[in-house]
Amino acid sequence: MNKTLIFVILAIAAGLPLAVTLCCNNSPWPDGAASSKTFFTSFSSAVKSLDPATSYYVHESAILDNIVEAPLDYDYLERPYKLIPRLLTEIPVPQYYAADGTLLADDPPPESVQRVEYLLTLREDLRYQQHPCFARDVRGHSIYADTNSMQLPKNLSSPQDFPVLDSRPLHPMDFKVALVRLCDPRLACPVYANLSSFIDGMEECSRKIQQELEERGFESGHLPQRQPLLVDYRTIPFSGLEVINNHQFKLILSRKYPQALYWLAMHFFAPMPWEALEFYHLAPVIDSGLSLKNWPVGSGPYLLQEMNPAVQIRLCRNSNFRKELWDGAPGQTLPFTEQIVFQYEREAIPNWIKFNQGYYDTSGIPSDMLDAATSFNSSGELALSQEMQERGMLLHCSVTPTVFYFGFNMLDPVVGGSSEQNRFLRQAISIVLDYQEFIDIFLNGQGVPAQGVIPPGISGACKANEFISPWDEQLGKPVRLPLQKARELMQKAGYPNGIAQDGSPLTLYLDHANAGASVFKAQFQWLKSKFALIGIQIEERPSELNRWRDKLQTGNWQLIFNKGWLADYPDPENFLFLFYSGNGTVQSKGRGANYVNYSSAEFDQLFRQLETMPDNINRQSLIEQACRILQKDAPCCWGYHPAKVILTHKWLNHYTPHDMSYSTMKYLGINTVLREQKQNLWNRPSRWPICAALIALSFFAFFALRGQNKPLPVSNKSNDVRHDLLSRTFSVKPVTDNTMENTAQ
């Protein structure tokens, strides 16, 4: 063998351990990340909007609510949930007025109240984050107003990349801009229908915005491609908010509504600086791809530093955040972490692996791993496996204030409407859709069947449903009615054995946006098997997501599956309003959350009564009546309430599950020393492949050297023959161009 080749082999053998030591690192984070005050977590759903006026998904709120701030918040540890001031000096107290302007004392009846005022007083230490929108010249104009794209920084990826940033205090006018903006019909704010029924002047405000847009050449439904028209929300008349001075303003309702305080803890009420709207309307900023939809401006503990929804979203500590103390960690100021990293993980298993390696600080448990990670203790409660406990992991379980339901379009002539026959059909389907079985198969038992729309833990939750699963006193739980009862209801509905009067089989259609999803395919097969029990054929009508949303808004669908609602606030009204006719999605032109378009005069009357009442026995009685009407009419198969199972590592401090607030990141602390130790322990490189490679290379080099030093027999053959002998001895094969091409192929 050529001595040079032997030398190379020995060099590789000598350098292999060093190379492995330097390069063998499976961490997804940069060097030093484990020792930094960074909270690492993940998300799996697409982030569509971080605009406070339109964002309404849980995973978006987990990001947005740590950047922008609402006037109120929930106490992090208190249960039942308790409101606390956030931007305000105190929780506002309502003042009730009669039609003649007389101040009403105590708690007047709703019918005597014509006006409600809440006085909100801002703290004096509130400032927005550093942002280019606040950079002003001596005249008060944006210094970027006359900037063209060529003058902007190259490779612009964030507002934080602009050369000049500035800030300012919060003003009451910012809250007016925020609320008036909710009235803009172009935004289709998801809570507009509910808010406008109470906040004075919202409907008039919406009409004035629409009128201004039309006067300026706006055609409804057709936004200009490049620069949408910017309405000056500051100048639009709005009677629902009155600015008093630099620190006070009034929120004004047209009727009594005790639950209005819960609104003030939602990001829809976060202040909106006019400068931000102006900035994101500039042509070069639009051309750069920056928008309020992706880059919110707030006063919260964090600001958005990196926005790459397909890879990573990163928040950094807001240097302008006020000094805020917390009783849970006396003497320490919030937030406790410098950064929050949200990493996009499409699949659950890679996320689970990284959590077990210590690279994520929290994680759910994939369905495939639930049996390995958990077990049931002697009390029948879910607990961590012994191995997970020994690794110092902690388990947090709770039934979430959420409902997922199977919905019927009440505008559809076959499954909807108020006729007795169609109601029997909906009840029959509700009986055969055994959601305990669904939970066991698809959720690994993590959830409870819903008996109505209100989840456990919120007053008014139903224990049973007399029309579908009545209470069994002997068993102490609700029991689903037998299949024979469902078949009897099908007979009453005019579909004996699923056959219509014309002799054709009853076929229903499920509209969805889950084409290609393997989980949905399995769930749809489950649905087909259940519908077949009563002779109904069900077919799917898949749509692209935006098309499916259009179908919901126009009522062009028949059945929907796994539509969900998570509580905005801990009150039964927040679930019952999903069936108030005024919130019908079609009737409200997409603004209402009554997706099934249910309408009942009897239910509406009860709802209007209970929504304005304080929480007392009389109100509870009305809630029970309203729930029974919904159970009887069955606009939905009530589905299930999911359980949330979260694992955390021992180094994560102060973690407490909170189902009402998403602004809780500031409370989380990291024991960076322990995290780094555990990551090093759990991710030691495997040494045996290195040793095996070293041994193999050493043996190869040894025998090669031995063969090199052995004298060859004397021969009179020419050097060409000797070369041929050596070539055959070591099987040296010249590599031709053709060989390389074939290998590459």
What would you call each of these model-derived segments?
Residues 75-78, 200-248, 252-341, 346-350, ...:
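Gly/Pro-rich hinge or "lid" segments in bacterial periplasmic/extracellular proteins
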Residues 258, 312, 396-404, 428-467, ...:
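Detector for C-terminal structural segments
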Residues 302-303, 415-416, 448-493, 514-523:
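Structural transition elements
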Residues 42-110, 297:
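N-terminal lobe/hinge region of extracytoplasmic solute-binding protein
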Residues 45-64, 75-76, 132-135, 163, ...:
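A structural "hinge/loop" feature
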Residues 74, 316-319, 346, 356, ...:
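A bilobed periplasmic-binding-protein/Venus flytrap-type ligand-binding module shared by bacterial periplasmic
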Residues 305-316, 343-412, 436, 440-442, ...:
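Extracellular/periplasmic solute-recognition and catalytic clefts
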Residues 90-194, 250, 351-354, 419-421, ...:
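Aromatic- and charge-enriched surface segment that lines or borders ligand/interaction sites
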